[in-house]
């Protein structure tokens, strides 16, 4: 009987030491700030975000994402599946976003459109890079403090 109690205590201790999100779901519980939008169009090129704190995404373990897009806030579902140790597929469901009129100039419309076109992610150099549909661009994110 004593052996079973010890084994039970060891099992509980080992479970407590496990990762906080299920294996293979590296986005869960992470928060990011947008630092730049890279377009494959020479006309647009790369646009640096002046205030990264105005454009954020938080990934929940419940497969929901929360966004700040300039002066608006929103949420969506997301689907992510690892394709390798540092990358995988990523798509967002329809984004429910408040509709406040943000002071101009604003990247609100461009960022919202791009989020709907995200198809994959990759971690590199401590950042999250989201690639868009048909390789049309990349959203570059840094960890939010």
Where are the predicted features?
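Lipid interaction determinants
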Residues: 2-9, 17-145
């Amino acid at each position: 009987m004593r052996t079973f109690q010890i084994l039970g205590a060891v099992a509980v201790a080992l479970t407590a030491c496990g990762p906080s999100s299920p294996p293979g779901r590296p986005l869960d519980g992470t928060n990011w700030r947008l630092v730049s939008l890279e377009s494959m169009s020479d006309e647009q090129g790369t646009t640096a975000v002046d205030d990264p704190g105005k454009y954020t995404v938080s990934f929940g373990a419940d497969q929901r994402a929360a966004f700040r897009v300039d002066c608006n806030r929103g949420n969506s579902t997301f689907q992510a599946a690892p394709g390798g140790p540092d990358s995988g597929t990523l798509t967002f469901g329809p984004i429910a976003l408040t509709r406040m009129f943000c002071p101009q100039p604003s990247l609100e419309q461009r960022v919202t459109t791009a989020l709907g076109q995200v198809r994959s992610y990759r971690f590199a150099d401590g950042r999250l890079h989201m690639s868009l549909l048909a390789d049309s661009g990349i959203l570059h994110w840094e960890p939010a403090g």
